[in-house]
Design a protein with these regions (language model features):
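Histidine/acidic-residue-rich catalytic or RNA/ligand-binding cores of hydrolases
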Residues: 22-32
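Catalytic-core region of carbohydrate-active enzymes that cleave or remodel glycosidic bonds
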Residues: 1-13, 40
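Structural recognition of the beta-strand scaffold that forms the well-ordered cores
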Residues: 11-14, 208-210
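Hydrophobic/aromatic beta-strand elements that line small-molecule binding cavities or substrate pockets
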Residues: 288-292, 302
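Short edge-strand/loop segments of extracellular domains
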Residues: 223-228, 319-336
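Catalytic domains of carbohydrate-active enzymes that cleave complex glycans
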Residues: 7, 34-195, 416-424, 431
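Beta-strand-rich recognition/accessory modules
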Residues: 193-205, 212-214, 222-233, 272-282, ...
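Active-site-proximal loop/turn and secondary-structure-junction residues that shape catalytic pockets
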Residues: 17-20, 320
Length: 434
């Protein structure tokens, strides 16, 4: 604020938590400090923080101040902290195990130091953010046998129920800005359950498919490296685990998804290296998708059929979200359809470590593109028949996770009754090109 005043700024819009239930992290402290600085931009911020904490937490102020400082150390450059971004998930790197352990210890000290129930309740409310981070981390899904599920599903459900009950006691209506807590509870009840998986495996890859999760492939495990080529979605994300992986989506055009959902089932007759899925679209179209392992490659063949009595405009998109490791060493390589060679550097100094691009016509890849980590490891390779592809999309982020997403869209066509649209794509590993 002092900088703004020096440059002649006469007014500022200061935004705090807007949910009617209140309860946002440090909302009272933030409002107090902002109000004081609006009156006097030269006020000592640390003194203001101490004033508020001592008045609000009494004898528990000292451990609460220690928690305040611990949180800030996670992102201060001089303390080896990480950059903080808007909409960071609970899995953000600055909310690591060491930080959580320190926070738990300080909140225990604060609760013990509280001189009465009113102060103890304030400490308990302040701890809800840490409780939520730990709760979402416990929600992480893994494959065990034929199931994709959290490790302790029953315990997780009990913890979630208790957490929601505490929110209600404090009158808190929002966990995050985008949705109300009641909707988050609905999503938890809907999505957090076991999902049966089908597994394909050869001597190079192991692939897990979850038909009930949009027919998506959740894992393509490179057995030589012992790692999943796909970026695993963050458990704090909305609608988790129905996110990410490798999936195909029907569109009415290149922007608008077809209305409703597609219900997928695993077809009979799967083998150890091949399986097929059938998807029933809500508008009556049908998708047939075959997945087959061939050495270091997962080959996919997808057919969208108009099974309705009327013409339907349709397109398909096949996308995989990859995790190639540290994006500062990652490039995307491909040859354009006009013959030009491209090596796209994803992370550049002094620029936001995220972005997206769309390619069509002569600019799009000529049937193959690769994600290469220059620090080592196999290339992540996607191939497709260029005559089937109308557009390609690339997006990446290194904010709170390392993720590179590559999507191929089919031609958009008006399908007459009984007509079909095909999109093939292969995904796997290869040797890095010089």
């Amino acid at each position: 604020m002092a900088m703004y005043k020096r440059h002649g700024v006469a007014g500022l819009f200061m935004e705090g938590a807007v949910s009617k239930g209140g309860g946002a992290e440090n909302a009272g402290l933030r409002s107090y400090v902002m109000a004081k600085l609006l009156w006097d931009v030269q006020a000592d911020v640390n003194k203001l923080v101490d004033e508020f904490l001592e008045a609000y937490y009494g004898q528990a102020a000292k451990p609460m101040r220690a928690y305040f400082d611990l949180m800030h150390r996670q992102v201060r450059p001089g303390d080896g902290g990480r950059h903080i971004w808007i909409y960071d998930p609970p899995s953000a790197p600055y909310l690591g195990d060491e930080f959580l352990a320190g926070a738990r210890a300080l909140f225990r000290q604060a609760e013990q130091a509280a001189e009465n129930d009113a102060v103890r309740a304030r400490v308990r409310q302040a701890r809800l953010g840490i409780d939520y981070v730990e709760l979402t981390r416990a929600k992480r899904f893994t494959v065990a046998g034929e199931w994709y599920r959290p490790a302790d599903l029953d315990g997780l459900k009990d913890r979630w129920s208790s957490f929601m009950s505490v929110l209600g006691q404090f009158g808190i209506t929002n966990i995050s800005e985008s949705t109300v807590a009641a909707r988050d509870d609905e999503d938890f009840q809907r999505y957090v359950r076991p999902y049966r998986v089908a597994t394909l495996e050869n001597n190079q890859l192991r692939v897990h498919i979850a038909p009930e999760l949009g027919g998506r492939v959740t894992h393509i495990i490179d057995k030589r490296a012992g790692r999943n080529l796909l970026a695993e979605p963050q458990p704090g994300a909305k609608q988790y685990p129905d996110l990410g992986g490798l999936r195909v989506t029907p569109y009415t055009d290149y922007v608008t998804r077809m209305p409703g959902t597609t219900t997928w089932t695993l077809d009979p007759g799967a083998t150890s290296t091949q399986a097929s899925l059938t998807g029933a679209c809500q508008n009556g179209l049908r998708i047939r998708r075959t997945l087959r392992l061939d050495g270091p490659t997962l080959r996919t063949e997808t057919v969208l059929e108009n099974t309705t009595p009327a013409p339907v405009t349709a397109a398909m998109q096949s996308q995989w979200d990859t995790d190639p490791g540290d994006l500062t060493a990652v490039v995307v390589q491909y040859r354009r359809q006009d013959g030009g060679a491209v090596e796209k550097v994803l992370i550049e100094p002094e620029k936001i470590p995220a972005g997206s691009e769309s390619y069509s016509g002569a600019e799009q890849p000529d049937g193959e593109w690769r994600v290469i980590n220059r620090s080592g490891g196999p290339a992540l390779v996607s191939r497709f028949p260029k005559e089937q592809a109308a557009r390609c999309y690339l997006s990446w982020t290194a904010k709170s996770e390392n993720r590179v997403a590559m999507a191929v869209s089919s031609l958009s066509r008006v399908l007459q009754p009984g007509e079909r649209l095909t999109l093939d794509a292969d995904y796997g590993t290869g040797e890095p090109q010089p």
